[in-house]
Structure formats: structure tokens, C-alpha cells
Amino acid sequence: MKAEQKHTPMMQQYLKLKAENPEILLFYRMGDFYELFYDDAKRASQLLDISLTKRGSSAGEPIPMAGVPFHAVEGYLAKLVQLGESVAICEQIGDPATSKGPVERKVVRIVTPGTVTDEALLSERLDNLIAAIYHHNGKFGYATLDVTSGRFQLTEPETEEAMMAELQRTAPRELLFPEDFEPVHLMSNRNGNRRRPVWEFELDTAKQQLNQQFGTRDLVGFGVEHASLGLCAAGCLIQYVKDTQRTALPHIRSLTFDRQDHSVILDAATRRNLEITQNLAGGTDNTLAAVLDHCSTPMGSRMLKRWLHQPMRCIDTLNNRLDAIGEIKDQGLFTDLQPTLKQIGDIERILARLALRSARPRDMARLRHAMQQLPELESLTASLTHPYLVKLAQYAAPIDEVCELLERAIKENPPVVIRDGGVIAEGYNEELDEWRKLADGATEYLEKLEADERERHGIDTLKVGYNAVHGFFIQVSRGQSHLVPPHYVRRQTLKNAERYIIPELKEHEDKVLNSKSKALALEKKLWEELFDLLMPHLEQMQNLASAVSQMDVLQNLAERADSLDYCRPTLVKDAGIHIQAGRHPVVEQVTSDPFIANPIELSPSRKMLIITGPNMGGKSTYMRQTALIALMAHIGSYVPAESAQIGSLDRIFTRIGASDDLASGRSTFMVEMTETANILHNATKNSLVLMDEIGRGTSTYDGLSLAWASAEWLATQIGAMTLFATHYFELTELPNLLPNLANVHLDAVEHGDSIAFMHAVQEGAASKSYGLAVAGLAGVPKTVIKNARTKLSQLEQLGQASDSPRPSTVDVANQLSLIPEPSEIEQALSNIDPDDLTPRQALEELYRLKKML
């Protein structure tokens, strides 16, 4: 006998459904609860902190069970999704009244971290992406999909570093990868990883899935037909989303290739160090996004973050954005736009739920409210003249047909769900109005019946009532029950009263309940038809949502530029960064002291700045503000400076700070060297490189050697625009030895035992490091500081007396290479070509080498 046959029919049904969804939690609807059994129950009780109970038995052992109330399920789902779990929702689809045996059930949706669309499960100002990754012959295919907007993209990173940068940029909530995926370390420290069968990544299968989704014969029109690795990932991704959503995906209509050469590439370390959307502690406070994002709509906020994480290289597109921001700023239009945009809200995600047919009544009400704001938006934008803004305004024009339909169809304040009706407005459908009138007329009839019966029989305690269990009834107090006429049939006895039914009331009950049932059934039918009526307008509404999002970002950046005194940057193709009175966009907002603005000049004749100065003097802030200003210019934003001319960049690299990578077993120094190696391999003459305190994680001479050699390589072999901060004073000799380098420093002034940081950038090298003064500020005991001063004096005297040459006094040849020079014999051997020597010459060379020993 099969194992399931030992169970009740209900448990047999559960086991069958669980076998179809073995790797995810199954929420099994039983009445007013979703129940979980066996290992699912144990896991859910730990994850959700709910009670673990028992039900029935299996093989002589009680079956573990846990459950959550159906009306509170969204909160529990939100917690599970946050933890990276997926959940299959199994509903009762049969009628308990007519079912023989267990009520029919089926899985109606699968909630996964990357495919959720429910408002309660999403962070409204962050994209919610699902991604798939594929690896072959050292190269990668990577696809991302935002189910809440239909945005579907693929790319093909060529190295692990580039792939890691993409994962950092997109931060997918769920990541699909094949069972034979080799670089598994890319999956570490992230929730929502999903192993998938290898065949789901086959190219032919992928093309078939994608053509089926888009209704096309091939993918040539999308420009992705040659991106084989990316298509393998995209095919797996679309199949997985279809499997989990259990419905059509009409809002996913295209696939775009995300070309790396169109963007300024930021690697994972750069995104982290510049604190673009996440600070070093993992939060969102004091980040660039926190300063710039005052968008009026959640969808605008999400778009701004995408711009920040993917700065552009196309100067024409960036100038269009800058022109648009300038026009809105000059007209002060953002003041009027913001309240109107706020009323429009997050229609992008409402449209996704509409496409998936999971929208709720209040989604429709919000969509109606958004549509009602469009005439006001049209009026406000009528004065705009820039072609980019005019085009956005055209896409955001009112859609009268949709607005009128929703105004006619949906009540002013509909309930949360359609389940109990009350959603469709009066006057929308004549038949529905008639059934409702019949059902609503019950109140008048019951009041009249109660008055008539009370007067006819002289029972002043007589009342007519209704409850869901017993239906309509006539209630009489126990003290007057003797006055009840014979045709009253007792239905229920209470402690102080009796309840009766009479034929007339029973007939009315049948009529009312039938009319309510008919009204509800018709209302649900009309609700489904409403989706069909709206679907032809879906693409137009999605274009509208995109246009409103862009308008929101542009007006937001105009407001930020106006409020924070930003200037318009000049974008040029030639390499170089020229900034007058530049400021750090975040630090200037959070510091209590006046922020000291500083200039920077980088050009082909001044490609590297060696930056010295005291710790806490502002070197890192100066470097970061340069990178952030360049990044802001490359999203088309105004920047915090008096003036700025920014040359086109291909990459921004940062090597700032480090900590142990315990998960990978890498020390601080190893992390530092890995990031340095990435820069030295991948930077180009069009890159901006920030190098801060290279070599501090090892011995003094090793560190100095590495810092010197790295700076020399960047200057002579790569020619990248570089800011090189160092505490090795010896490196200030480099500008004297190599072309196109310069020294700058941040100054400080000592007063006795105290120190004042000036935070102003000056030309030339710093005179000293002020390390002991900073230690005193940090609270190091005065006795320790005093001993340190004594030791410093001794070391300085020792250094002056030493015969060993300092890097600042050795000749140029030695200073350019801190690696030990080859010996005379090694040099002589390297100059000998044995194939060019006769036997006699070879013997003579051997005697000559012997004399060198």
C-alpha cells in the first residue's frame, strides 16, 4: 500500500500538492488558516516564531503542524520573503457544500523574493529584481527582470570582477543559477539563491521561451540575437517567472541588451566606498541617494537610483537631461509639480498587478485617482519647450477612456478585496443594480414585518434579526414566549429568549440570500471583465508611468540644484576634470561646521595628484567628492561646485579603506591588494582612479615599494586620471621624476599640544604628518604621547645618521625601481646569447664571469 494511503483523504491531497512543490514552503488553506505540515511546519515555526503543534499521525508518529490566520497572511509572507524564502499558496477552489470528500485545492501562486508584486511585500523606493546567471568558458551571461515594471535586460560580463560589479549594482532579491555553476563564491553571503536544472539554460530552449513570450519568430528586433550567454540566462528567468506566477505576463514585452560601453563602469568596491545608495554600515543614511532623492513618487525614486548605479557616457543624452533640469529650475516649476506628482503615486507597480490580474479594488481606485491628476500635469507642463520635456509631456497626456471607465466602474472608497463585493459602482451595470436593490430592500421589509407581528400578537419584546449561522429569525423574550402563535416554528433556544421562523420570513430569506449570491457572482464577473477592458491600454499606461517617473527625477534634481546651490557641469569628450570650489554632496549636509570647498585640476599634463597631509585632514573626503561630482555629472545632474568641466569617463575605481573579508579568509592587506590588482589590470587613460594609503597593511618598506610601483605604473603605463593619497612622504619625489604628476596637500596648524585642520587643498607636499597630534585628539593617554615623541626624536636622529640612502636622496634610476637591482653577474648573463657564441668565445665568457665572483 502506498504511503499516502495510510493518511486521511485530506492529508493525501496535501502530500500530493507538496510533492509538486518539494523545495518551498506550502501554505495549505484550511478554513480560516493556512496550515503547514511536517518539515515545513518545523521550519516555519522557527522563521516566523509561531507555535508548533501536532495533528493526526504518520507511521505512528504525530504530524507536526503550524499555521497562520488567512487574514494576516501578508505580514507572514513579507517576513519569509525578507528571509529569502519562497512560498506556494494553496487555496480551496471547490465548494465545501457540494464537495464529496476533501474540498478541491490547488496552488494558485508562488510567492518568491524576486517575483512578489503585493504592495505589503515590497520596499516602495527600491527595485525588486530577480536575476539569472550563466557561466561558460570564463565568460558570463546575466539577465535581470523587474516583475513589478516589466523591465527585462541582459548583459555579458567578461570577467569575474565585472560579474561581481553587476551583482553589486543590481542587488537581485533572487538569483537563479545552473546546477553545474562553478564560480560558486559569487553566490556567497546572499539570500534567495535558487539552483536550477542545467537544461533550463539551453540556448534553443531559451530562444523558444522568449519568442513565445514576445510573440515573435526571432529576437533580431531586440538586438540580442548574438548574446548567447545572456539569452541562456534570460530563457531560464522567463520560464521560472511563468512557473511561479501561474498566469500570462503581458507587461513583459521586450528584452534589451545592457551594453557596458554605454555606461561608466563602477566595480563593487567603488559602489561600496562611494556610499551611493548604501553606507559602509549597510544602512541608507548619509548616502548620495539620501541627499539627492527627494522624488515625489516611489517610481521616480527607483529610477533615480538606477541612474546613480549606471551613470552614462553619452554626452548628448546627459546634456538633454541637464537642459531639462535647467528649464524646470529656471521656471521654478518643481514647486507646482511636486504635489501633483505625489498624487499620481506608484502607478508602475499597480500596472504590473493589473497585468498579472492580481490588482485589488484599491489599486483600481488609486489608478483612477492618478488618471484624474493628468489634466493638471498637462496644464503645468504646457509652458515647457525643450524637446525632451515636450516628449515626456506627450507620453504623460491624459487617457480619457481609462479614466472614465474607472470612474464609472469603481466605487469611491472600495473595500480591500473583491471577495465580499461592494466594489462595482452603482449605475455601472443595470442587472447588478437590480439584484442589489432586491437584497438591500430586506431592511425595510424586516422593519415592517417586525412592527406588524408585534402589533398583531401583542408581543412588545418581539424582534426580527439575522445571523450567518441561522439566517433570519423572530426573537421573543422567555417571559412572553407563551404569547407566540402556533404557526411560529422554534429555530433556536437561548438563555433568556426563543427564536422562531415563519413561512413568510423563510420565503423572504431565500429571496434575499439568492439576490445577494447573484449580485456577488455578477460583481466578480464584472470585476474580471474590467481587467479585459483595461488590458488593451496597458502599453500606453506603462509608457505614461515611465514618462512620469522621468519627469519626477528631473524636477527632483532641479529642486536639489536650486536648494543646495549646485551648478551645471560642462561635459566634454577630452580627458580632464576641472572643478572650482567643489564640495562633498553628503558631508556638507551632515557636518555642523562650514564645509571648506576645494578646487581640483586634472588634465593630460596633470594626470596624477600625490595627496599628502594629516590623518583627519580631509584627504579621503577630497578624493571622494571628486568621484561623486564626476558621477553626478554622468547621470545628468547639477553638481556641488562653483563650476565644473568634466571629461568623459569610462570607469571610476576606488581603493579606499579596507577590512578583513572573514567569509573568504582574506586579510585586510589581501583585500587591499586584490582591489589594487583589479585597478592596475582594468584602468584606462579615460578612467578616474582613487588610491588611498596603498601599502599600509604590511611592513614599511614593502608598503612603500608597492605604493611607489603602483603610482609609477598608473602614471607611465596607464595614464589614468589619478588621486593618490599617501602617508609615505617619499612618494612626493615622484612629480620631480615623472612627467604629468603634481603634489597637493591638506594643511593643518599646531598650537602647542592641539591641532587645527584647515581642510584646504594647497599645492605642494605636506611638511609633516601630525600623527601624534591626531592620536592626542583621539584620546590616547598623554604619557603614551610623550613617550611616542621621545621615540620619534630618536628614530629621526637614527635616520639622519644612517648611511643607508633615503628614497628622497637616491638617484633617479634607483628611485624608479625599489625592487633590488640585478647583480653584475646576473646583468652579464642576461646580455649573453649562447646561440651567437663560438666555442672559444663561450670559454672566454666563462673565465670572465668566474673573475666577477
Curated annotation (Swiss-Prot):
Task: List the GO cellular component terms.
Answer: cytosol
Q: Which residues cross the membrane?
A: none
Pfam family, any one: MutS_I
Q: Which InterPro entries match?
A: DNA_mismatch_repair_MutS, DNA_mismatch_repair_MutS-lik_N, DNA_mismatch_repair_MutS/MSH, DNA_mismatch_repair_MutS_C, DNA_mismatch_repair_MutS_clamp, DNA_mismatch_repair_MutS_core, DNA_mismatch_repair_MutS_N, DNA_mismatch_repair_MutS_sf
User: SMART domains given for it?
Assistant: MUTSac, MUTSd
Q: Which GO terms describe its molecular function?
A: ATP binding; ATP-dependent DNA damage sensor activity; damaged DNA binding; mismatched DNA binding
Top-level taxon: Bacteria
Mind telling me which CDD domains this protein's record contains?
A: ABC_MutS1
Keyword terms of this UniProt record: ATP-binding, DNA damage, DNA repair, DNA-binding, Nucleotide-binding
Q: Any keyword DNA repair?
A: yes
Binding, ATP: G613, P614, N615, M616, G617, G618, K619, S620
The Gene Ontology biological process annotation of the record reads: mismatch repair
Briefly, what is this protein's role? This protein is involved in the repair of mismatches in DNA. It is possible that it carries out the mismatch recognition step. This protein has a weak ATPase activity.
HAMAP family the record matches? MutS (MF_00096)
Q: Which family does it belong to?
A: Belongs to the DNA mismatch repair MutS family.
Q: What is this protein called?
A: DNA mismatch repair protein MutS
**What is the source species?**
Vibrio parahaemolyticus serotype O3:K6 (strain RIMD 2210633)
The root-end lineage is: Bacteria, Pseudomonadati, Pseudomonadota, Gammaproteobacteria, Vibrionales
